[in-house]
């Protein structure tokens, strides 16, 4: 900090002489703080419940029967197989992306559960999960976990523009969801 310089007696007298006849201005301006909108936060209890639900659905012991030939795909029994075809063709473009690179299996399960919960909360029906090539651990496990979740309607190996065989496009069941009209 700079030291305050003191004025000499002469300078102080000169200042008083120059300021004679002036009066102090009264500050009457009121400054209003801008009103900020409250951002609706997801309650902590709900987040904890979503995480618990996510870990509940993904089991390592249960192995759903998935087709091992050709690209990785799955369609829930009550969903039309045409939805998988639309995923394959790229008719659906994902709105949320999840990159699992570098995560452990436990972290990947938690992130998958969080992605599905976020999709349902935000009414996003298509997401992309990038599991990568790596050591093939997450590449093998990710489809098995997704097939176990009741809100996953279908998934298919992603088209090249979304990651090809290192990613999956996932169709999530959202409340009041209707497939979009094709042009």
Swiss-Prot record:
InterPro entries assigned to the protein according to its UniProt record, in alphabetical order: Smr_dom (IPR002625), Smr_dom_sf (IPR036063), SmrB-like (IPR022990)
Source organism, top-level taxon: Bacteria
GO MF assignments: RNA endonuclease activity; rRNA binding
SUPFAM superfamilies reported for this sequence: SMR domain-like
EC number: 3.1.-.-
Key words of the record: Endonuclease, Hydrolase, Nuclease, RNA-binding, rRNA-binding
Main enzyme class: hydrolase
Pfam families per record: Smr (PF01713)
A Gene Ontology BP annotation from the UniProt entry: rescue of stalled ribosome
Smr domain sequence ranges: 98-173
PROSITE patterns per UniProt: SMR (PS50828)
Protein family (similarity comment): Belongs to the SmrB family.
Function, as annotated: Acts as a ribosome collision sensor. Detects stalled/collided disomes (pairs of ribosomes where the leading ribosome is stalled and a second ribosome has collided with it) and endonucleolytically cleaves mRNA at the 5' boundary of the stalled ribosome. Stalled/collided disomes form a new interface (primarily via the 30S subunits) that binds SmrB. Cleaved mRNA becomes available for tmRNA ligation, leading to ribosomal subunit dissociation and rescue of stalled ribosomes.
Subunit note: Associates with collided ribosomes, but not with correctly translating polysomes.
Protein name listed in UniProt: Ribosome rescue factor SmrB
Source organism per UniProt: Escherichia coli (strain SMS-3-5 / SECEC)
